């Protein structure tokens, strides 16, 4: 497909860019490939910055970026490290767990939840909301799933508006307080905008990190030489994290809307139609990545597109990398003989075609005492 038709049409006529170069070329021309028509193939734009073009997108991004500065992310390192150890403490004596349910899912939800003013006892509720809301962003949503999503959004909306009001009255040091007070060129976020941008942060910060952590760890366990290599040389961890991101590509695709007729990588495209960017396919492009089907923690260079490219490059990439690094380092050190319950098993995936990853990953290891 990538070699013969870099931009192809599926059976429904939807155009899709499958090669690394085609995806990059589209992202370098936001004036031709617009976000403003919505990033899903069969849904209109939502009032959040991911569905905007500059200058509106740039202003919104500057306002939200106040909560994701390098210093603010660095300041969270100690608390995230402690959280990783707490999660491992909860399972280390058992000798078995579900890696997704017990480690990969709770970590990003706790981190993002803390930033959004979520108390520990509310995290499971937020995790359900996040899962239900992501389901809506997949194509072909049933009426039942649509209602579940609407109920989740209504509950999230009520919670977030109450949190916003509380932070306006009595600011703390959490992300909601930062966003409430953020100002660029005299502009501030309205309550409606705060609800939508924190929702984007919730979805973007929860499922993506969860799926990279679980899917990347699966590859380390299925490629035992790579696991052993990391244990012998922990300095290779940064490269391993990048390979986990390339391999899992948790955001599978996004759409752009054509603003004019054009021919693009051999395919005629019409103004007003959508073209899908296949990030996962681009991350396995043989023209860019040597032996792309090989999981290699020493891969260099590794210019993957897990965080996108261009003006919409993922704002939370530093936070995601920090979470992935801190948890993976601790899993390697504290659960050194971690292994899949069944090496030859096919693990279940979440039924989604936008943000997707492992639903469950049973693992076993030698029991050990908790740190706490």
Swiss-Prot record:
Q: Which InterPro entries match?
A: Cyt_P450, Cyt_P450_B, Cyt_P450_CS, Cyt_P450_sf
Pfam families per record: p450
Q: Which UniProt keywords apply?
A: Cholesterol metabolism, Heme, Iron, Lipid degradation, Lipid metabolism, Metal-binding, Monooxygenase, NADP, Oxidoreductase, Steroid metabolism, Sterol metabolism, Virulence
Q: Which domain of life is it from?
A: Bacteria
* Protein name, UniProt field: Steroid C26-monooxygenase
Q: In which pathway does it act?
A: Steroid metabolism; cholesterol degradation
Described by its record, this protein's role is as follows: Involved in the utilization of cholesterol as the sole carbon and energy source by degrading the side chain during infection. Primarily catalyzes the sequential oxidation of the terminal methyl of cholest-4-en-3-one into (25R)-26-hydroxycholest-4-en-3-one (alcohol), (25R)-26-oxocholest-4-en-3-one (aldehyde), to finally yield the carboxylic acid (25R)-3-oxocholest-4-en-26-oate. Also able to sequentially oxidize cholesterol itself, not only cholest-4-en-3-one.
Positions binding heme in this chain are: 314
Q: What induces it?
A: By cholesterol.
Which protein family is named in the record? Belongs to the cytochrome P450 family.
Q: Extract the GO molecular function terms from the UniProt entry.
A: cholest-4-en-3-one 26-monooxygenase activity; cholesterol 26-hydroxylase activity; heme binding; iron ion binding
Protein EC: 1.14.15.28
Instruction: Look up keyword Oxidoreductase and say if it applies.
Output: yes
